[in-house]
Amino acid sequence: ETSGMTRYYPKYYRQTLNSIKDSLDILQAQGYRNIELSAIYEGDPSVWGGLGATNNYAIDPSIGTLEDFEDLLREVHARDMRLTFFGNVGYCWYKAPFFEKACDDQRNGVYSKERNWFHFSDKKLNDNWFWSDRAQAYYYSCWGNSDGAEGRIPSYNFNNWEWQEECRNYLDFWADKGVDGILLDAPEVYDGITDDIINESIIKVLNRRGILTNAEGASNIEKWISRFDFKLIQGFDMYGWGGGKRSEVLNARRNQNPCELNGKLKSYRDRIVALGATTITPPMWEIPATNEERLFELAYLISM
């Protein structure tokens, strides 16, 4: 089965869970069978729609409550639709209470699980290390130099067993709510990640529940599909976002040369399908386009 999926950024666009619930009949009539909610937990919406959490286990009060979320999920399932949760176990928001505690414990030399969830250093080892007055040390942030981030998204330390355990708790919590899919933000670049850690801390948790998941930005397609049994792959062969905005579909349309897409389809989409998985490729809304160009882009992506 295939259908369109529509993604919501509730915190960023100030949409409540109840307003999304009220739109379900319209979405169903339009042919959507899956809705995706991005970063609905507590967190500042200013960077990437709020992917950096301040509380991984609570709905952001600006969009509703856990009860509202559970009600929305029931209404989605009552219509034979699916709900996918886009979350993040790679980094948090720098004002998260648990990161502030980690900084305090680092400064005071106190052992704690929160302190061990992050990487601290007395030295600036490279440009991904940012100074914290509170910790009196540098902390690691993989995406800290990205547009708008400015070091405000400290990375979790996957090389630490206490964070691995917390990651499993996080995934279990949202899976227990009954979501149908959990999409993860760029797992290949989690701090300290290895294949074994991914398998134990993420894959086994989701696979034992039969939950759909997606490796955003996956480069080694064969590994993610064949070894980790991912059924949905969101790579960047057809488009790029953030600091590298790119749409191969729009480029081909503007150059009046559809042959430009052949190589991309063979090297990316066809490989994924041959391995038994599905691609997820959204329109590149960050690139301005005419109505005609946007319709062409949408039609092409739907046909993939």
Predicted segments, located by residue:
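Active-site-proximal helices and loops of the catalytic beta/alpha 8
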Residues: 73-82, 91, 169-172, 180-276, ...
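Short strand-loop junctions, especially beta-strand C-caps/beta-turns
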Residues: 3, 40, 187-189, 284-287
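Generic low-complexity segments that are intrinsically disordered, proline-rich and/or Lys/Arg-biased
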Residues: 11, 259, 283-284
